[in-house]
């Protein structure tokens, strides 16, 4: 029978694992780091009563990422329903209603911070998504749940005021929303701002994408306005454009985390496709000849500016959180 090989790899972390006859860890770095990893690995596997798990650490930046990888391997291979939760700088591993393992960083954590709340609903780290869209929230809840983080949205805070997006750039708008809501709630907040940039129009509609044809414009009206602006641009190569997304995570007393991504393409001459929204029916993806509205949801999520930005965020978020 073929032995399963598990792997996680991004720019910051790279782990490989398999199951054999005994627990074993390898790491070809400095001795001090190796000793720390061995102590951690032995403590976790012994506590979870795991045998035969073999782990190789190639690159490591995030204890959370490493624990999540190990638990994913155990879940897939052994069917264990293990969950990691972040709480006040520690990592808690549980199964069902039982707390099995606590990982504390070398510098320790504040006892008052760790035990300060008697309210079970306050237990664990929380990320507030600056949206009322339940579909978007569901996707982020799935992603951050793997990092042991509870996700809420603005529907959980009905009394919060609306934050006007008055910035001149995507980052300014995303920062404004995330940092304002973080100050008001004391929570860690994720916000995004996205739009379409057409090169020959100097980057327009840009931050005004949703209201290009007016404050209450519909998608159809915005698309018609864009086609009108490009009516005299006959050379397809000069109709280049990109969708852009900026994501900002803000938290009290921290420097905000910023990631962004572009999805390059061209503006077509007529709407095509029934999927998506906004400018999707006009946006020709790369050199495929297909509009974003002709892609399936899965295809779009894999390629799009938002999908790329979220991938970047999930790679750098654990390291950002550990630095604070």
Swiss-Prot record:
* Lineage of source species: Bacteria, Bacillati, Bacillota, Bacilli, Lactobacillales
Which residues are Mg(2+)-binding? Answer: 193
Cite the Gene3D superfamilies for this sequence: 3.90.950.10
Q: Name any cofactors this protein relies on.
A: Mg(2+)
Q: Which GO terms describe its molecular function?
A: dITP diphosphatase activity; ITP diphosphatase activity; metal ion binding; nucleotide binding; ribonucleoside triphosphate phosphatase activity; XTP diphosphatase activity
Q: Where is this region: NTP pyrophosphatase?
A: 127-324
- Annotated residues for binding of substrate: 131-136, 194, 277-280, 300, 305-306
The record's annotation in InterPro entries points to: dITP/XTP_pyrophosphatase, ITPase-like_fam, RdgB/HAM1
State the oligomer form and interacting partners. Answer: Homodimer.
Q: Which GO terms describe its cellular component?
A: cytosol
Question: HAMAP family, from UniProt?
Answer: Non_canon_purine_NTPase
Q: Which UniProt keywords apply?
A: Hydrolase, Magnesium, Metal-binding, Nucleotide metabolism, Nucleotide-binding
Claim: Oxidoreductase is one of the keywords in the record: no
Query: Can you tell me which family this protein belongs to?
Result: Belongs to the HAM1 NTPase family.
Look up the EC number in the record and give it.
3.6.1.66
According to UniProt, the reaction catalysed is: XTP + H2O = XMP + diphosphate + H(+); dITP + H2O = dIMP + diphosphate + H(+); ITP + H2O = IMP + diphosphate + H(+)
Q: How is the cofactor bound?
A: Binds 1 Mg(2+) ion per subunit.
Q: Which Pfam families match?
A: Ham1p_like
Its recorded name reads dITP/XTP pyrophosphatase
State the CDD domains in the record.
HAM1
């Amino acid at each position: 029978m073929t032995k399963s090989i598990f792997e996680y790899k991004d720019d910051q972390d790279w782990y490989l694992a398999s199951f054999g006859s005994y627990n074993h860890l390898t790491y070809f770095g400095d001795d001090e780091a190796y000793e720390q990893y061995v102590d951690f690995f032995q403590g976790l596997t012994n506590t979870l009563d795991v045998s035969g798990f073999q782990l190789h650490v190639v690159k490591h930046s995030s204890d959370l990422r490493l624990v999540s990888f190990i638990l994913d391997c155990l879940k897939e291979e052994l069917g264990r329903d293990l969950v990691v939760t972040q709480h006040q700088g520690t990592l808690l591993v549980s199964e069902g209603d039982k707390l099995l393992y606590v990982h504390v960083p070398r510098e320790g954590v504040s006892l008052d911070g760790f035990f300060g709340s008697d309210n079970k609903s306050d237990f664990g780290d929380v990320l507030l998504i600056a949206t009322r869209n339940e579909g978007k929230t569901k996707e982020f809840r799935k992603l951050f749940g793997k990092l042991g983080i509870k996700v809420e949205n603005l529907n959980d805070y009905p009394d919060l005021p609306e934050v006007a997006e008055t910035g001149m750039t995507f980052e300014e708008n995303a920062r404004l929303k995330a940092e304002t809501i973080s100050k008001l709630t004391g929570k860690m907040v994720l916000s995004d701002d996205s739009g379409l940039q057409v090169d020959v129009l100097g980057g327009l509609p840009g931050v005004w994408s949703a209201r290009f044809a007016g404050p209450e414009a519909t998608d159809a009206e915005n698309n018609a306005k864009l086609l009108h602006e490009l009516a005299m641009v006959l050379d397809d190569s000069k109709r280049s454009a990109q969708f852009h997304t900026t994501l900002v995570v803000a938290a009290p007393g921290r420097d905000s985390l910023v990631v962004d991504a572009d999805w390059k393409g061209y503006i077509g001459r007529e709407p095509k496709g029934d999927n998506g929204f906004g400018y999707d029916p006009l946006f020709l993806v790369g050199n495929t000849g297909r509009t974003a509205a002709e892609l399936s949801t899965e295809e779009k999520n894999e390629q799009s500016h938002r999908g790329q930005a979220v991938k970047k965020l999930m790679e750098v978020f654990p390291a950002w959180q550990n630095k604070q």
